[in-house]
């Protein structure tokens, strides 16, 4: 409500999508493709995206609308190389007036796509917030959902982001992933809390037809266990000073 008071009728949010990932997570139903299989299309996609950004910038300038929030999501935007990320950010600044932008987020969802060079490029491009999303801090669960990184890489990516100058870092976790249980999820919460990100977003696994887990019918934690995961997470987060900040 307080944030809404800062907005005017001419304010808007801009979302820029990069529909590529290192691998496709088993729970994912978004429009996104593995860079290994479809990476040849990335240069053409980026070229088209840059043209669209330029065109959109002209429309915004003519209409008088103001960007208040900007979000680069995906997919995994940090699948882009440092050079391509710099190219994207330069196009954004060339085409968009960000003088009234309250928050500029880049989704760095996969820790294995982050390094200090890329994070510094993103920070230099005036991003104010980055999201580093382990989804779980269990290497066993990560393997079960097809993510090729470890919990250790998540921790390393977090501290790299801090060294790059980010002080607004979000981290996502998902309750209900295969091979997870109440104690495992509680441990993920504990490990993320130990890092002290500014936001912790807890999702519940929601499978749709496009997800590999939907068609495979792999065994998942029972609903009662997922409910307990969420209740435990809320207690732990509130005990550590975190408050609910948005509805997903």
Tell where the protein language model's regions lie, with residue ranges.
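N-terminal [4Fe-4S]-dependent radical SAM core
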Residues: 1-14, 63
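Local cysteine-cluster metal-coordination motifs and their immediate loop/turn environment
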Residues: 17-32
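Conserved non-cysteine loop/helix-boundary elements of the Radical SAM core domain that shape
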Residues: 32-235
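Conserved acidic functional residues
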Residues: 17-19, 172, 248
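A generic secondary-structure signal marking the coil-to-beta-strand transition
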Residues: 10-14, 68, 196, 241
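Short, well-ordered beta-strand segments
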Residues: 14-15, 73
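C-terminal accessory regions of radical SAM enzymes
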Residues: 238-248
């Amino acid at each position: 409500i307080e944030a809404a008071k800062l907005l005017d009728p001419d304010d808007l949010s801009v979302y820029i999508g990069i529909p590529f990932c290192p691998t496709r997570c088993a729970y994912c139903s978004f429009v996104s493709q593995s860079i290994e299989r479809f990476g040849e299309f990335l240069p053409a996609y980026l070229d088209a995206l840059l043209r669209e950004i330029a065109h959109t910038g002209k429309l915004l300038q003519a209409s008088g609308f103001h960007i208040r929030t900007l979000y680069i999501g995906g997919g995994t935007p940090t699948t882009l190389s440092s050079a391509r990320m710099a190219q994207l950010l330069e196009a954004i600044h060339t085409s968009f007036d960000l003088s009234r932008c309250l928050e500029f987020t880049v989704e760095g969802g996969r820790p294995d796509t982050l390094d200090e060079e890329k994070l510094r490029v993103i920070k230099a491009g005036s991003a104010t917030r980055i999201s580093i999303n382990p989804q779980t801090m269990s290497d066993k669960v990560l393997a079960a959902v097809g993510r090729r990184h470890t919990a250790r890489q998540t921790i390393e990516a977090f501290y790299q982001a801090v060294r790059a100058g980010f002080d607004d870092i979000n981290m996502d976790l998902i309750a209900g992933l295969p091979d997870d249980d109440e104690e495992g999820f509680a441990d993920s919460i504990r490990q993320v809390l130990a890092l002290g990100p500014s936001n912790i977003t807890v999702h519940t696994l929601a499978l749709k037809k496009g997800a590999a887990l939907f068609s495979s019918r792999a065994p998942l934690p029972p609903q009662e266990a997922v409910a307990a995961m969420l209740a435990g997470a809320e207690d732990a987060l509130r005990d550590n000073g975190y408050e609910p900040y948005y509805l997903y």
